[in-house]
Every structure is written in structure tokens, then in C-alpha cells.
Amino acid sequence: MTIAPDPVDLAARLIACKSVTPSDDGAMNIMADALKSAGFTVHLLTKGQAPDGPVTNLIAIRGEGYPHLAYAGHSDVVPAGQGWSSDPFTPTIKDGYLVGRGAVDMKSSVAAFIAAASRYTEHKGTLSLLITGDEEGPATFGTPAIIEWLNEQSIKPDYCLVGEPTSVERLGDTVKNGRRGSVNMWIEVEGIQGHVAYPDRACNPIPVLARIISDLESWVLDKGDQWFQPSNLEVTSIECDNKATNVIPALAKAQLNIRFNALHKGAELVDSLKKRVAAIDPKARVKAAISGEAFVTEEGVLTDTISAAIAKNTGITPSLSTSGGTSDARFLTKLCPVVEFGLVNATMHKVDEKASVEDIRQLSRIDEDIIKSFLG
């Protein structure tokens, strides 16, 4: 008989691992041991090289056949920074909260699901856990590597629950059924350096860049739709490496980000922006990096089942939302329908990050009901 780990105790053990991306510091082995004890076959994959690696990923599988429910999460954390009231990697329970880096994002969620899967071992179909050590970093060697391995093994989940902290005020108030896409762009306008007293012998790139920025700021990308707010362009940096007051600079740069909804594809937005820039300065250089496409999981079996489990345990009917930043769900949506649900996110990435002990236990009960609903 499997003795299920206590979710809070397991979360504390994981928090004690200084798994700042891309370091693991033993977190994967702790999870692997717990999952093996619960009857899972565990695969540990190491990918990549410094500076973004090596990264350790975990794939645990139990059972076989349809349906296949996957849980996805990450064990890496962001740097702790300064100003904590206690050591961020010495887990502490204070006033009913588990305090430590990763308590919210997202070691407690991973621990809650492992505990739930350890309690409910006799099920039909397939249950898997896909845990990466590279979500907070570039994600180059994380979830994409897991998906590559699954494809090589011809393993395809039917549904995926991502345990990111989605709750806002109370556990269960918000479920993410989609995410906006994100593209970063860099614009360079080249001029001709010269003395400010002789502008006829120079070409100032700053006014040209200013016109480009003004045009982009006035660009209405869309008005949003049923699931998404309007797409948004933000200028995040303007640079001109010139400290002299009597020199017209030779180069001006801008950096911007577009968070876009499912009405767009990243490449189409990049192409449209390049055309707008070229209309003002055909010689301007534009570079782009698309970090994720927008996606939405329509209401159906996955959203309904998770919402029902939340309502049963909390009395709350969650709101479906696509707000916030990107997550690894942007990769997993290529495999199957994806929904994200987890703890209250108020302190994630903050000093004295903390999760309610009762919320961790309740999350584990919700996870168990989700497993039962799909695989019972």
C-alpha cells in the first residue's frame, strides 16, 4: 500500500532545494522518489549546456490507454533577492502560511498534485506528470524538450492541467483557459553623426525614431474578443548612446513588446509592424523574437471538470480568464487542450513569498477529484 506524502511537508522539502533556474539542487530526485513509490515510471532528462543549462526535466507515467490526463509544472524558481524576513530556502510555517521561494510559484502546487496522485492510485487510463526545471528561464531546454520526448515515444495526452498559480483573491476564483501571445521587437534608426551647430552636415535619427514610436503608439491592433482584452503594444526602452550635448548621434534604438490575442499570429504582427516602420524610414532595422502564440481552450470537458472539482471543495465557481503573462501552456497547447489552475498568486516572485497551508491541502483535494473525474 502506498503511503501518500503530506503535500505541505513535500512542498517544504522542495523549497529547501535552491533550484534557481537552471539549477536543480536535488528537487527532481525528491519528486522522482515520491512518484516511484506511487507506482509511476519516472524518466529524468538532462538537456542543454551553460549558460542556459544543463536543465533536468521529469516525466512520470502511470497506467496506459485512454484517457490520458497530464499535469504540467516546474520546479525551478526565480532568484530570491534581498529583504526576506527569513532564509528563502529554509521553509518556514508562520501564521498559517508556508514561507519560502517557490511556495506559490510553484513547488507547493507540484507537491499537492504528487500527494493527490499518491492517494488515488487505482485508476483507468493514463496519468502523467511533466515537470521542467526551465520555466522561469529561457525555457529552451524545458517543456519543449519534454514535448520532443513525448513525440518520440508517440505519447499524446488527451487533457493537460498546468498548476500555475492562477487564483487572485481566494483559491479557486480564477482558472486560465488561454494566454496572450508575446513578441519582443527592436528598432534601430541610423543617422549621420555631426556637430549640433552644423545640422546640414548630419542626420539626426532621434526625430525619425520619435515619429516611428508615435505611429506605433497610435496603432489600434484590435478591440479584443469574447476571451481576450485588446492586444497591447508597449515601448519598453529608448536608447541613444550619446552623452555629449554638442553632438548629433549616429544611432537611435527602441525596444517594444506586443501582447496579442488569438486574433493574430506573431509573424503577421511582425510583418505589419515592419511595414509601418518602413513607411517612415525604409532603412530602419527591425528585429523580432516571438516567445509564444496566443491560444484559448474553449469551454468543454476540461474546463467543466476542473471547475466542478473547484466548486465541490471551495464552494466557488471559478472565472475563466486569459489575462496575465505567458506560461509553458503556450507549448503544451500544441499537444492537447490545456487549462491552468493553482494557488493564490499575490506573493509570487516577491520577498517573503508564501502560500496558505490550508490552501495547499485543499488544492491537493481538488487535484484528487480532478484525477477521479477523468480516470475514475
Curated annotation (Swiss-Prot):
Binds 2 Zn(2+) or Co(2+) ions per subunit. It comes from Zymomonas mobilis subsp. mobilis (strain ATCC 31821 / ZM4 / CP4). Catalyzes the hydrolysis of N-succinyl-L,L-diaminopimelic acid (SDAP), forming succinate and LL-2,6-diaminopimelate (DAP), an intermediate involved in the bacterial biosynthesis of lysine and meso-diaminopimelic acid, an essential component of bacterial cell walls. Belongs to the peptidase M20A family. DapE subfamily. Keywords: Amino-acid biosynthesis, Cobalt, Diaminopimelate biosynthesis, Hydrolase, Lysine biosynthesis, Metal-binding, Zinc. Its EC number is 3.5.1.18. Its cofactor is Zn(2+); Co(2+). CDD domains: M20_DapE_proteobac (cd03891). One of its GO terms (biological process) is diaminopimelate biosynthetic process. Zn(2+) 2 binds at D105, E136, H349. The lineage of its organism: Bacteria, Pseudomonadati, Pseudomonadota, Alphaproteobacteria, Sphingomonadales. Zn(2+) 1 binds at H74, D105, E164. One of its GO terms (molecular function) is succinyl-diaminopimelate desuccinylase activity. The active site is at D76, E135 (proton acceptor). The keyword ATP-binding does not apply. Pathway: Amino-acid biosynthesis; L-lysine biosynthesis via DAP pathway; LL-2,6-diaminopimelate from (S)-tetrahydrodipicolinate (succinylase route): step 3/3. Homodimer. It catalyses: N-succinyl-(2S,6S)-2,6-diaminopimelate + H2O = (2S,6S)-2,6-diaminopimelate + succinate. This is Succinyl-diaminopimelate desuccinylase.
